[in-house]
Amino acid sequence: MAGDKQGDKQAETTSVPAEARERHAQLAEQIEEHRFRYYVNDAPVVSDAEFDRLLRTLEELEERHPELRTPESPTQKVAGAYATEFTAVQHPTRMLSLDNTFNDDELAAWFERIARELGEQEYHFLCELKVDGLAVNLTYERGRLVRAATRGDGRTGEDITPNVRTIAEIPDRLAGDKVPDLVEIRGEVYFPMEKFQELNARLNEAGDKPFANARNAAAGSLRQKDPRVTASRPLHMVVHGIGTLEGYSGLTRLSQAYDLLKAWGLPTSPHNRVVDGLDGVREFIAYYGENRHSVAHEIDGVVVKVDEIRLQGRLGSTARAPRWAIAYKYAPEEVNTKLVDIKVGVGRTGRVTPYAQVEPVTVAGSEVEFATLHNQEVVKAKGVLIGDTVVLRKAGDVIPEILGPVADLRDGSEREFVMPAECPECGTPLKAMKEGDIDLRCPNARACPAQLRERVAYLAGRECLDIEHFGGVVAAALTGPLEPSEPPLVDEGDLFDLTVEKLLPIKAYVLDPDSGLPKRDPKTGEEKIATVFANKEGEPKKNTLALLQHIEEAKTRPLARFINGLSIRYVGPVAAQALAREFRSIDRIEQATEEELASTDGVGGAIATAVKEWFAVDWHREIVRKWKAAGVPLEDRSTGEDEGPRPLEGLTVVVTGTLENFTRDGAKEALQSRGAKVTGSVSKKTSFVVVGDNPGSKYDKAMQLKVPVLNEDGFAVLLEQGPEAAADVALSAEE
């Protein structure tokens, strides 16, 4: 089966060089991983500019090789399609993303396309500030707020109604007599810049990790499990659009709609402006490029929209973005500062990464003391020396990055950075894991304190078990305390064996949440030490008992989260989901052959090899054994074979195009829960192809191979009545 499937995939892209296919797969995986970190964790690890660069590289690759552009490609998806904490809800009208421009030439090219489409008609442009916040959709029925949801994948978002109700300026009821029967109102929730620094100061005071920027503060505050926490944060909202509108007519221009929104009591931006053409847009962009910090919220660009609603309909949309609107992204901000030192950190997979310590400097509204340098080759390429004055950019107003040195300011005291030959934490000689690797790694995975600390922090984090009160400080205390000499966590397997008695004696350094280094007493300069889990009377702190309760609750997390938490190389949230969905238990994954693993959608050869290598290590298998002994199921019982009939067992189904009543993931889940296998390519072995709007080449191939094709009504028949009934309503080449 594995060979057949791989052959099918290869046949579909025979004209594409293997190098291009491999590069496409790498880029797609990186982009999906970064989207997950951005939308689920509210903690991106790359800048907006770097993410945009990756996405553009993928788009350019697909332009050269259109066969690689599938509906599953990140270029065809609306960002944000991950939900973890809140109930999924569907938007009546889809929320799209925006296409981006980054310079005047690209902006002018967009204007030329609009002019070609609209000809000699009179039209105007509405300019808005692009708020760097969290996109939210408000639904009002007969003037009453009934739901607030995140954008999600554009069709399905997270229900955050209780939290949005805590934002004072969002009315529970629309003002005035003339309110529609149903209206969706789109906007951005943001955290005011003037309050952002105050919040981070309080978090630092409490020993909690501060937010990297105001956007993360808004997202993190809005996605709290307890609405009281949200209510304590000074969140605001700006509305900027209407989705579904029923029971109201007469709007001809978007700028009129904004007047209407304001009359209903909703917060609109005072900065919006209607202009006649490109020169007016350029003027607006230039003004706010120079005055961006005069605005109450962070901005990362300007949104330009065709103002006439009738013409918006004529211009239409692509699968992910309207053609009548464009986002102009400002260049990241840059400042000069001193490069004090280059240090190295060790990650959970042993990767050793240099990072810069700079003299504290304010950039893009926040103070920066550390910046990324990626690897030793990047340090060489940038040409920076320790002691240099360097140009620091907070790219996308998120992740600080060093661009290069100001070489003219060198005085001869600067020195080169030398990558250490040994792990800075355990002393093990560093090495590349395979020939050609740029990154050096510490191979001492079992005993390296840094790797264990980072793995435990990742396991407890939002992407995996999502254990409250368990951050990097707790992970450090449990894996490397000053007292007792034997840490309570020797490896991840000990997590569910923690008790109050094991926690109370622990003493550890008080760590700075930003740098991970011990804090020092401002008077004595000595490193601060604290009893982490006990109060002055030696009793457990309130958070200690809560931590143990949350650890116990984490035993029931879905299998995919445990797989992700094993820190297997190349296995992130997407691959973990694929493995859990296909094999449904940790034992089946361990027993699977490399070929069976590789043939799983979303896995592939490199991940399959890494999984087999991980399970070949004795102490890795011991982690799994300990978790089982502690009562962790390590299987997805909800999809087990013992839960009754699976009417679509043995079927292979391809889903393509846009369905009205299902998201792509929702359709896959509906099929997989009934036993069907969902694949990304059509072959003679495909049982059915389900098609929505804009199905693309897969529909053509299905007709060519005479594979039964189901529209959305036929798909419903398949789910409700089974394959025989679906075959009766399917389309085929003979028809």
From Swiss-Prot:
What EC number is given for this enzyme?
6.5.1.2
Binding positions (NAD(+)): D48, A49, E50, F51, D52, S97, L98, E128, R151, E188, K305, K329
Q: Name one GO molecular function term.
A: DNA ligase (NAD+) activity
**Basic and acidic residues bias (residue ranges):** 1-11
Domain of life, per lineage: Bacteria
Per its UniProt record, what Pfam families does this chain match?
A: BRCT, DNA_ligase_aden, DNA_ligase_OB, DNA_ligase_ZBD, HHH_2, Nlig-Ia
Q: Does the keyword 4Fe-4S apply?
A: no
One GO cellular component assignment for this chain's record is: cytosol
- HAMAP family registered for this protein in UniProt: DNA_ligase_A
- The family this protein is said to belong to: Belongs to the NAD-dependent DNA ligase family. LigA subfamily.
Record-linked NCBIfam families = dnlj, PRK07956.1
Q: What is this protein called?
A: DNA ligase 1
Q: Which organism is it from?
A: Streptomyces coelicolor (strain ATCC BAA-471 / A3(2) / M145)
